[in-house]
Amino acid sequence: MTAACCAQPILSPEAAIAALAGEDNQIRYYAAWWLGKHQVQAGCAALCEALFDERYRIPSGGYPLRRQAARALGQLKNPQAVPALIAALACEEDLGLREAVIQALAMIGDRRAVHPLVQLLQSQQPQPYEALIEALATLQVWSARPQIEPFLYHSSERVQCAAARYLYLLTKQPQYLERIVQNLNHDNMYLRWAAIFDLAALGHRQAVDAILAAKVPNSLKLLNLKRILETLLDGDRSQLNNGEFCQNQSDRETIELLFQAIDDLLIQL
Protein backbone atom coordinates (compact mmCIF):
# COMPACT_ATOMS: atom_id res chain seq x y z
CA MET A 1 0.00 0.00 0.00
CA THR A 2 1.33 3.45 -0.86
CA ALA A 3 1.97 6.23 1.59
CA ALA A 4 -0.74 8.28 -0.11
CA CYS A 5 -3.32 5.62 0.76
CA CYS A 6 -2.26 5.48 4.38
CA ALA A 7 -2.08 9.22 4.95
CA GLN A 8 -4.76 10.99 6.92
CA PRO A 9 -7.15 13.03 4.77
CA ILE A 10 -6.68 16.78 4.83
CA LEU A 11 -9.80 18.11 6.51
CA SER A 12 -8.41 20.93 8.63
CA PRO A 13 -5.79 23.69 8.51
CA GLU A 14 -3.70 21.79 11.05
CA ALA A 15 -3.70 18.66 8.90
CA ALA A 16 -2.73 20.63 5.79
CA ILE A 17 0.14 22.43 7.55
CA ALA A 18 1.41 19.14 8.95
CA ALA A 19 1.17 17.47 5.52
CA LEU A 20 3.42 20.13 4.00
CA ALA A 21 6.27 18.80 6.14
CA GLY A 22 5.66 15.19 5.07
CA GLU A 23 7.42 13.00 2.50
CA ASP A 24 4.66 12.30 -0.04
CA ASN A 25 5.02 14.89 -2.79
CA GLN A 26 1.47 14.54 -4.09
CA ILE A 27 0.01 15.05 -0.62
CA ARG A 28 2.29 18.01 0.02
CA TYR A 29 1.20 19.57 -3.28
CA TYR A 30 -2.45 19.03 -2.35
CA ALA A 31 -1.86 20.51 1.10
CA ALA A 32 -0.44 23.69 -0.44
CA TRP A 33 -3.43 23.90 -2.77
CA TRP A 34 -5.83 23.32 0.16
CA LEU A 35 -4.29 26.11 2.25
CA GLY A 36 -4.59 28.55 -0.65
CA LYS A 37 -8.09 27.45 -1.63
CA HIS A 38 -9.35 27.98 1.91
CA GLN A 39 -7.21 31.10 2.49
CA VAL A 40 -5.74 29.72 5.70
CA GLN A 41 -3.66 32.60 7.05
CA ALA A 42 -2.12 30.33 9.68
CA GLY A 43 -0.46 28.44 6.83
CA CYS A 44 1.51 31.46 5.57
CA ALA A 45 4.78 30.56 7.32
CA ALA A 46 4.62 26.91 6.22
CA LEU A 47 3.92 27.95 2.63
CA CYS A 48 6.86 30.35 2.71
CA GLU A 49 9.07 27.43 3.76
CA ALA A 50 7.64 25.26 0.97
CA LEU A 51 8.51 28.04 -1.46
CA PHE A 52 12.18 27.02 -1.08
CA ASP A 53 11.73 23.24 -0.71
CA GLU A 54 13.70 21.65 -3.57
CA ARG A 55 12.91 18.02 -2.77
CA TYR A 56 10.07 17.77 -5.30
CA ARG A 57 11.59 18.34 -8.73
CA ILE A 58 10.38 16.91 -12.02
CA PRO A 59 12.76 15.67 -14.78
CA SER A 60 12.32 18.84 -16.84
CA GLY A 61 13.70 20.83 -13.91
CA GLY A 62 10.52 22.40 -12.53
CA TYR A 63 9.44 22.53 -8.89
CA PRO A 64 5.69 21.73 -8.67
CA LEU A 65 5.40 22.18 -4.90
CA ARG A 66 7.22 25.50 -4.93
CA ARG A 67 4.96 26.75 -7.73
CA GLN A 68 1.85 25.68 -5.83
CA ALA A 69 3.12 27.31 -2.64
CA ALA A 70 3.54 30.58 -4.56
CA ARG A 71 0.01 30.35 -5.96
CA ALA A 72 -1.37 29.66 -2.48
CA LEU A 73 0.47 32.65 -1.02
CA GLY A 74 -1.09 34.80 -3.73
CA GLN A 75 -4.51 33.56 -2.66
CA LEU A 76 -3.75 34.41 0.97
CA LYS A 77 -2.81 37.99 -0.03
CA ASN A 78 -0.77 38.20 3.16
CA PRO A 79 1.91 40.95 3.04
CA GLN A 80 4.05 38.88 5.43
CA ALA A 81 4.83 36.58 2.48
CA VAL A 82 6.31 39.36 0.33
CA PRO A 83 9.97 39.03 1.45
CA ALA A 84 9.93 35.27 0.81
CA LEU A 85 8.28 35.71 -2.58
CA ILE A 86 10.80 38.36 -3.61
CA ALA A 87 13.64 36.04 -2.58
CA ALA A 88 12.08 33.23 -4.65
CA LEU A 89 12.35 35.39 -7.78
CA ALA A 90 16.06 34.50 -7.76
CA CYS A 91 15.32 30.92 -8.90
CA GLU A 92 16.64 30.76 -12.47
CA GLU A 93 16.08 27.05 -13.16
CA ASP A 94 12.27 27.24 -13.18
CA LEU A 95 10.59 30.09 -15.05
CA GLY A 96 7.24 28.54 -14.16
CA LEU A 97 8.05 29.16 -10.50
CA ARG A 98 9.10 32.72 -11.27
CA GLU A 99 5.82 33.25 -13.12
CA ALA A 100 3.79 31.94 -10.16
CA VAL A 101 5.75 34.18 -7.77
CA ILE A 102 5.19 37.26 -9.96
CA GLN A 103 1.46 36.54 -10.10
CA ALA A 104 1.36 36.10 -6.31
CA LEU A 105 3.11 39.43 -5.76
CA ALA A 106 0.60 41.11 -8.05
CA MET A 107 -2.30 39.60 -6.11
CA ILE A 108 -0.87 40.83 -2.80
CA GLY A 109 -0.29 44.29 -4.25
CA ASP A 110 2.58 45.30 -1.98
CA ARG A 111 4.81 48.09 -3.30
CA ARG A 112 7.94 46.29 -2.08
CA ALA A 113 7.61 44.11 -5.17
CA VAL A 114 7.99 47.01 -7.61
CA HIS A 115 11.79 47.34 -7.68
CA PRO A 116 12.61 43.62 -8.10
CA LEU A 117 9.96 43.28 -10.82
CA VAL A 118 11.35 46.25 -12.74
CA GLN A 119 14.81 44.71 -12.42
CA LEU A 120 13.52 41.52 -14.05
CA LEU A 121 12.01 43.55 -16.88
CA GLN A 122 15.36 45.24 -17.48
CA SER A 123 17.27 41.96 -17.37
CA GLN A 124 18.74 40.54 -20.56
CA GLN A 125 17.61 37.03 -19.57
CA PRO A 126 14.30 35.48 -20.73
CA GLN A 127 11.43 36.16 -18.36
CA PRO A 128 7.73 35.19 -18.06
CA TYR A 129 6.93 38.48 -19.76
CA GLU A 130 3.15 38.14 -19.86
CA ALA A 131 2.88 37.72 -16.09
CA LEU A 132 5.56 40.35 -15.48
CA ILE A 133 3.89 43.05 -17.58
CA GLU A 134 0.47 42.24 -16.11
CA ALA A 135 1.91 42.53 -12.59
CA LEU A 136 3.43 45.93 -13.37
CA ALA A 137 0.03 47.06 -14.66
CA THR A 138 -1.71 45.79 -11.53
CA LEU A 139 0.82 47.60 -9.34
CA GLN A 140 0.48 50.71 -11.55
CA VAL A 141 4.19 50.99 -12.26
CA TRP A 142 3.73 53.52 -15.05
CA SER A 143 7.40 54.50 -15.07
CA ALA A 144 8.10 51.22 -16.90
CA ARG A 145 6.32 52.42 -20.05
CA PRO A 146 9.53 52.87 -22.14
CA GLN A 147 10.54 49.27 -21.39
CA ILE A 148 7.06 47.86 -22.07
CA GLU A 149 6.17 49.61 -25.34
CA PRO A 150 8.53 47.40 -27.44
CA PHE A 151 6.58 44.33 -26.26
CA LEU A 152 3.71 45.42 -28.51
CA TYR A 153 5.84 43.78 -31.24
CA HIS A 154 6.93 40.69 -29.29
CA SER A 155 6.80 37.31 -31.04
CA SER A 156 4.18 36.10 -28.53
CA GLU A 157 0.70 37.48 -29.15
CA ARG A 158 -0.16 36.98 -25.48
CA VAL A 159 2.77 39.18 -24.49
CA GLN A 160 1.59 41.74 -27.05
CA CYS A 161 -1.83 41.71 -25.37
CA ALA A 162 -0.27 42.17 -21.93
CA ALA A 163 1.63 45.20 -23.21
CA ALA A 164 -1.53 46.61 -24.81
CA ARG A 165 -3.41 46.10 -21.54
CA TYR A 166 -0.70 47.94 -19.59
CA LEU A 167 -0.66 50.83 -22.06
CA TYR A 168 -4.44 51.11 -22.18
CA LEU A 169 -4.67 51.28 -18.39
CA LEU A 170 -2.04 54.02 -18.46
CA THR A 171 -3.27 56.12 -21.39
CA LYS A 172 -6.90 55.06 -22.05
CA GLN A 173 -6.05 55.40 -25.75
CA PRO A 174 -8.42 53.22 -27.84
CA GLN A 175 -5.75 51.76 -30.14
CA TYR A 176 -4.42 49.68 -27.25
CA LEU A 177 -7.88 48.35 -26.45
CA GLU A 178 -8.33 47.48 -30.12
CA ARG A 179 -5.14 45.38 -30.05
CA ILE A 180 -6.81 43.14 -27.47
CA VAL A 181 -10.23 43.11 -29.13
CA GLN A 182 -8.65 41.87 -32.39
CA ASN A 183 -7.63 38.64 -30.67
CA LEU A 184 -11.26 37.82 -29.87
CA ASN A 185 -11.52 36.60 -33.47
CA HIS A 186 -8.19 34.77 -33.51
CA ASP A 187 -8.08 31.23 -34.88
CA ASN A 188 -6.36 30.08 -31.69
CA MET A 189 -9.03 29.38 -29.08
CA TYR A 190 -6.63 29.98 -26.19
CA LEU A 191 -5.71 33.42 -27.51
CA ARG A 192 -9.42 34.27 -27.68
CA TRP A 193 -9.78 33.18 -24.06
CA ALA A 194 -6.71 35.15 -22.96
CA ALA A 195 -8.05 38.24 -24.71
CA ILE A 196 -11.39 38.02 -22.95
CA PHE A 197 -9.66 37.83 -19.56
CA ASP A 198 -7.55 40.86 -20.50
CA LEU A 199 -10.69 42.79 -21.43
CA ALA A 200 -12.36 41.87 -18.15
CA ALA A 201 -9.35 43.26 -16.29
CA LEU A 202 -9.86 46.61 -18.06
CA GLY A 203 -13.56 46.95 -17.16
CA HIS A 204 -14.27 49.41 -20.00
CA ARG A 205 -17.73 49.74 -21.60
CA GLN A 206 -16.25 48.88 -24.99
CA ALA A 207 -14.70 45.80 -23.36
CA VAL A 208 -18.17 44.68 -22.25
CA ASP A 209 -19.54 45.04 -25.78
CA ALA A 210 -16.54 43.14 -27.19
CA ILE A 211 -16.97 40.29 -24.70
CA LEU A 212 -20.65 39.92 -25.59
CA ALA A 213 -19.77 39.67 -29.29
CA ALA A 214 -16.80 37.32 -28.80
CA LYS A 215 -16.66 33.80 -30.23
CA VAL A 216 -16.25 32.12 -26.85
CA PRO A 217 -18.57 29.95 -24.73
CA ASN A 218 -21.31 31.76 -22.83
CA SER A 219 -19.93 30.39 -19.57
CA LEU A 220 -16.67 32.25 -20.23
CA LYS A 221 -18.55 35.43 -21.10
CA LEU A 222 -20.54 35.13 -17.89
CA LEU A 223 -17.44 34.63 -15.75
CA ASN A 224 -15.72 37.72 -17.12
CA LEU A 225 -18.78 39.97 -17.13
CA LYS A 226 -19.24 39.11 -13.45
CA ARG A 227 -15.60 40.09 -12.84
CA ILE A 228 -16.21 43.50 -14.40
CA LEU A 229 -19.44 43.98 -12.45
CA GLU A 230 -17.77 43.05 -9.16
CA THR A 231 -14.95 45.53 -9.88
CA LEU A 232 -17.40 48.36 -10.55
CA LEU A 233 -19.52 47.55 -7.49
CA ASP A 234 -16.43 47.25 -5.28
CA GLY A 235 -15.41 50.71 -6.46
CA ASP A 236 -18.83 52.06 -5.49
CA ARG A 237 -18.61 50.48 -2.03
CA SER A 238 -15.13 51.91 -1.52
CA GLN A 239 -16.38 55.39 -2.39
CA LEU A 240 -19.33 55.01 -0.03
CA ASN A 241 -17.05 53.94 2.82
CA ASN A 242 -14.93 57.04 2.22
CA GLY A 243 -17.95 59.32 1.97
CA GLU A 244 -17.03 60.18 -1.62
CA PHE A 245 -19.70 58.38 -3.65
CA CYS A 246 -20.36 60.07 -6.97
CA GLN A 247 -21.08 57.43 -9.62
CA ASN A 248 -20.86 58.86 -13.12
CA GLN A 249 -23.41 58.30 -15.86
CA SER A 250 -21.08 56.03 -17.84
CA ASP A 251 -20.55 53.67 -14.89
CA ARG A 252 -24.29 53.54 -14.19
CA GLU A 253 -25.01 52.63 -17.79
CA THR A 254 -22.28 49.98 -17.80
CA ILE A 255 -23.61 48.40 -14.59
CA GLU A 256 -27.15 48.31 -16.02
CA LEU A 257 -25.82 46.72 -19.22
CA LEU A 258 -23.90 44.13 -17.20
CA PHE A 259 -26.92 43.13 -15.12
CA GLN A 260 -29.02 42.72 -18.26
CA ALA A 261 -26.31 40.79 -20.12
CA ILE A 262 -25.69 38.46 -17.18
CA ASP A 263 -29.42 37.74 -16.88
CA ASP A 264 -29.63 36.96 -20.60
CA LEU A 265 -26.61 34.64 -20.47
CA LEU A 266 -27.96 32.79 -17.43
CA ILE A 267 -31.18 32.09 -19.31
CA GLN A 268 -29.20 30.66 -22.23
CA LEU A 269 -27.03 28.33 -20.13
From Swiss-Prot:
One Gene Ontology term of the molecular function aspect: lyase activity
Keyword Phosphoprotein: no
SMART domains the UniProt entry points to: EZ_HEAT
Keyword Transcription assigned: no
A single GO cellular-component term on record: phycobilisome
Keywords tagged on the record: Antenna complex, Lyase, Phycobilisome
Function: An enzyme involved in the biosynthesis of bilin.
Similarity field: Belongs to the CpcE/RpcE/PecE family.
Protein name in the entry: Bilin biosynthesis protein PecE
Species classification: Bacteria, Bacillati, Cyanobacteriota, Cyanophyceae, Nostocales
Protein encoded by which gene: pecE
